[in-house]
Amino acid sequence: MSYIRSVKGREILDSRGNPTVEVELITDQNVMVKASVPSGASTGENEALELRDGDLNYYFGKGVLKAIANINGPIAQILVGEQVYDQERLDRMLIEADGTDNKGHFGANAILGVSLALARAGALTANLPLYRYIGGVHAHLLPCPMMNIINGGAHADNSLDFQEFMIRPVGASTLREAVRWGAEIFHTLKGILKKAGHVTAVGDEGGFAPNLSSNEEALELILLAIEKAGYQPGKQVVLAMDCAASEFYDKTTKQYFEKKKKQKNQVFAERTAEEQIAYLETLCQNYPIDSIEDALAEGDWCGWQRLTERLGRKIQIVGDDIFVTNPKFLEKGIELGVGNAILVKINQIGTLTETLQTIRLAQTNNYACIISHRSGETEDSIIADISVAANTGQIKTGSLSRSDRIAKYNRLLAIEAELESTALYQDSNRFQIF
């Protein structure tokens, strides 16, 4: 047996220079682990509460000292002396002690940091890789990456309202090959943008953030980069998008409008839900797109039903803001026939136990799962282990730049090397568009 000797929280910075939570846990066997917590920019209304201090004179209100105090006080009192292997029981104890639906008392950022540290301590004490400790002997599936190489929306200061334009190296035979393809396409795209006179600065998730005239221009540039790098669009490499539609949805008029173009006094489109669905359908007809995330606003359940009816047998319809990694909302989606895939973000729900519960619910009901980073990340690579542990087959962890993104790819490469001949690289998206 191994017991928790101490739990300490501290305030560190994320990839955007904002405060976040790091937890250090030490066992009675002197095993010491750390875990840190990410933060999102475009967030769902029903996400677990990220506790911030609100003191405008300290990090402009974004400090997390309240969450740290909760870790060092009541949370530590609950956990010290408990067995490190009791992940689910301890997660449930923290949820019960918090006593709120959204973890608003302790803060989801406090609870999650502790939950992840518990898993790391258990794995290290058991002398197992983290993915094996969480997933057992059947954890061997390396995920196909969604690589966000052009950023827009809340992740970049440009005129694109769609938030992410991604490539998926579905034709690669190994994760190592997939990462190489992605890196080569990324660097090729940089050359294309530079030659065209575009800025090659990157956004929050490491993708380029040029000022482009339309979503179509972004897709065309990516296709050109794929071809110029020597790969076949639609066969070896396909496209994916995250619209993050809640960010440009007007609840009063129930219209989707190009908000960023409007703010820059440019000509902008305005669409009803039906028009938005038709527009996306046209994009899928014209480009090798096999996955679209958050195509409509999170509260537009009827629109999501129509979207799934129209496109759900052709491509992957991914719910992020509408499901927020919460089994309650996923169950509603399953009942209503909304989407066919879920984006899984550990800080949306706030514990490892609930994250795995949501993944099991999705997989049982034939929903694909994509493990995801957040736009405000740290060097912590735990989502790589979780993706392999749960055999999700897909991961979204940014572009091929910025160390906070590359850390996850490098961890996956290490896992693949460790698994050797038992490693399987296979995309879990069941839709083949070629």
Curated annotation (Swiss-Prot):
Cofactor(s) it depends on: Mg(2+)
GO BP term, example: glycolytic process
Major subcellular location class: cytoplasm
Catalytic residues of the enzyme: E205 (proton donor), K345 (proton acceptor)
Keyword terms of this UniProt record: Cytoplasm, Glycolysis, Lyase, Magnesium, Metal-binding, Secreted
Broad enzyme group: lyase
SUPFAM superfamilies named in the record: Enolase C-terminal domain-like (SSF51604), Enolase N-terminal domain-like (SSF54826)
Sites where the protein binds (2R)-2-phosphoglycerate: Q163, K345, R374, S375, K396
Pathway: Carbohydrate degradation; glycolysis; pyruvate from D-glyceraldehyde 3-phosphate: step 4/5
Role, per record: Catalyzes the reversible conversion of 2-phosphoglycerate (2-PG) into phosphoenolpyruvate (PEP). It is essential for the degradation of carbohydrates via glycolysis.
Protein family according to the UniProt entry: Belongs to the enolase family.
Protein name per Swiss-Prot or TrEMBL: Enolase
Organism: Protochlamydia amoebophila (strain UWE25)
Classification of source organism: Bacteria, Pseudomonadati, Chlamydiota, Chlamydiia, Parachlamydiales
Gene this protein is translated from: eno
